[in-house]
Amino acid sequence: MAFCGPRTAARLSHSTRALHYTHRSFASPRTLNEVVIASAARTPIGSFQGTLSSLPATKLGSIAIKAAVERAGIPADEVKEVYMGNVLQAGQGQAPSRQATLGAGLAISTPTTTINKVCASGMKSVMLAAQSLMCGHQQVMVAGGMESMSNVPYCMSRGATPYGGVKLEDIIVKDGLTDVYNKFHMGNCAENTAKKLSISREEQDGFAITSYTRSKAAWDSGLIANEIAPVTIAQKGKPDIIVQEDEEYKRVDFSKFPKLKTVFQKDNGTVTAANSSTLNDGAAALVLMTAEAANRLNVTPLARIVAFADAAVDPIDFPIAPAYAIPKLLSEAGLKKEDIAMWEINEAFSVVVLANIKMLDIDPARVNVNGGAVSLGHPIGMSGARIVGHMAHALRKGQFGIAGICNGGGGASAVLIEKL
């Protein structure tokens, strides 16, 4: 065993004091910073193999990020970090969020991280950025989500090619829409929830029709247009195409709703193509900053982030997971459900929203008042960021809004904001 003399001990004591000082100099602030949403922008949502299908998710992400930064009215180099949700990353190349960030014209020195929490990816990006800002690690960040389901490839397992041909798997289904624990489509989980909570097909069809009518009314009134970052698509030898409106909500024939066969459960099933969300392309981005940074940069924020929470349940019960995350929010904020003016619960399936309305006992008239993913579309990496951004635009001053979204594996994320 080694012993040290007085001089060595003195040097060690001095070094210890220096290390202690260094540690303290990098400590988090004693009080958390207030975080505000400076801007929120999104691309239109394109139908599967539709108007936006020529653009990869990273390009759509660049368009959303660039628009959000411009609308915040700040120099691009003020953004110090970017988080972007993206689920179906196969074939996109390294670091999709980095591609989207540099494509938006942000500084080469901007660190980026791609977030995958399945359908909650875009919302989790907002939550993680808010945490970084609250702790004082950064002052200005961009967070959002992006997906181009039209460009997702097929895959083949590595190894010897078997006799009789090869088997290709659809990455949309394999990595995005399959419950890996029960080895079936997420729609089977939706059927399970419908059965448990006695939610009929008629209720789900009725909800879907309401989603379409609300989306159309919101677009007709001009309410959604201020969220949109138009997408320009170059054409060879022809004028460019400018896409500035969601594509999916206009592609509906209500007369077919009661005639459609159920998709996931043939006997006594309730979930159909009409009362489920669709495969889509799009991106959304929000500029988040501390209240101090907003003052310094003369930014008038849209809203402030009050609280956020995650929850997890049995994977088969993923549709009801928001009903476990949302009470955490209300408790943390000291609010009651009656204090919430607007609810955005992502419409992965109509039964998801109906189940959460039932479990939370909330007013359906305040839920998804301008439509949702069943009618607008569900680019899975984008949707969580889209509903937070939509609330930041749609709420009135002083109102509170909650956005919740379920995700595969039995998870959910939720965010509470206040309009400023």
Swiss-Prot record:
Q: Which UniProt keywords apply?
A: Acyltransferase, Fatty acid metabolism, Lipid metabolism, Metal-binding, Mitochondrion, Potassium, Transferase, Transit peptide
| Catalytic activities | 2 acetyl-CoA = acetoacetyl-CoA + CoA; propanoyl-CoA + acetyl-CoA = 2-methyl-3-oxobutanoyl-CoA + CoA
Q: Name the residues annotated as site: Increases nucleophilicity of active site Cys.
A: 378
Transmembrane stretches in the record are none
Under Gene Ontology molecular function, one entry of this record is: metal ion binding
The principal localisation class reads: mitochondrion
Q: Does the keyword Transmembrane apply?
A: no
Q: Return the PROSITE patterns for the record.
A: THIOLASE_1, THIOLASE_2, THIOLASE_3
Q: Where in the cell is it found?
A: Mitochondrion
Look up the EC number in the record and give it.
2.3.1.9
Q: From which domain of life does this come?
A: Eukaryota
Which residues are listed for CoA binding in this entry? 212, 251-253, 256, 277
Listed InterPro entries: Thiolase, Thiolase-like, Thiolase_acyl_enz_int_AS, Thiolase_AS, Thiolase_C, Thiolase_CS, Thiolase_N
GO term, biological process aspect, one: fatty acid beta-oxidation
The EC category is transferase
- Please list the residues that bind K(+): 212, 273-274, 374
Annotated Gene Ontology cellular component terms: mitochondrion
Active-site residues per Swiss-Prot or TrEMBL entry: 119 (acyl-thioester intermediate), 406 (proton donor/acceptor)
Per the record, the pathway is: Lipid metabolism; fatty acid beta-oxidation
Keyword check for Metal-binding: yes
For this entry, the transit peptide stretch runs 1-33
The subunit structure is: Homotetramer.
Family to which the UniProt record says this protein belongs: Belongs to the thiolase-like superfamily. Thiolase family.
Q: Which PANTHER family match?
A: ACETYL-COA ACETYLTRANSFERASE, MITOCHONDRIAL, ACETYL-COA C-ACYLTRANSFERASE
Functional description taken from the UniProt entry: This is one of the enzymes that catalyzes the last step of the mitochondrial beta-oxidation pathway, an aerobic process breaking down fatty acids into acetyl-CoA. Using free coenzyme A/CoA, catalyzes the thiolytic cleavage of medium- to long-chain 3-oxoacyl-CoAs into acetyl-CoA and a fatty acyl-CoA shortened by two carbon atoms. The activity of the enzyme is reversible and it can also catalyze the condensation of two acetyl-CoA molecules into acetoacetyl-CoA. Thereby, it plays a major role in ketone body metabolism.
Q: What is this protein called?
A: Acetyl-CoA acetyltransferase B, mitochondrial
This protein's encoding gene: acat1-b
